[in-house]
Amino acid sequence: MTSQRLPTGGDVRISNEDGRVAAVLVNGGTAKPVPGTWSATSELLVRELAPRFPAIRFVEVRYRLKSWRALDSCVADGRAALAAAGRATTLLIGFSLGGAVAVRLAATESVTGVLGLAPWLPSELALDGLRGKRLDIVHGTWDRHLPGIPGVSPANSRAGWERARRLGVPGTYTVIPRGLHGCALRSRRGGLVRLPHWRDWVAATAATLEELAG
């Protein structure tokens, strides 16, 4: 794994540098703009899946500021990460707030689709950039509205997915029974705490990556 500072001031971590296609993982945030951190959910997914998919270059993004109030800043970091990924075929994986970030970036030529993991898809979010792409969503049934991130719930992401379907965007919607918000948290010591049903999140993500890897 290598780390790289983006021109925007954000950061990326890259696994499987020689992969011929890319998966760019954009993460969540809070209401108050705070310095970005590495996503525990993204880190666990890459740890589990990078060895299984050597053909995929995994690019994790750390925003300068992680907040839905700084969405434009997060999108700029994501766009810089797509450039750093440097592949003609790229899947965007957006967790929580990252769902909106990924949708905002979907029109990028190299992007073939978006995989939203418990994504934040507010009703005012324009989905036109998804035309000609895919939108697949995975959400835990026990996820609920979180402080600082209005609208993160299975009902919200389902509504966003159905809006995309009405635009002719193909994709699947998968629920994880009793699944929470993502598959991991960060411990006080910096390690990963795996949430219940984390294997289901890994399996659902792997199913989409199978198509990407070809």
What are these regions (language model features)?
Residues 3-55:
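Short, surface-exposed "cap/lid" segments of acyl-processing enzymes
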Residues 37-48, 142-171:
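Active-site-adjacent alpha-helix of alpha/beta-hydrolase-fold enzymes
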Residues 67-85, 201:
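Alpha/beta-hydrolase active-site loop
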Residues 93-102:
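Gly/Ala-rich beta-loop-alpha elbow adjacent to hydrolase catalytic centers
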Residues 110-121:
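A conserved short beta-strand
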Residues 131, 136-143:
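Short beta-strand/loop motif that positions the catalytic acidic residue
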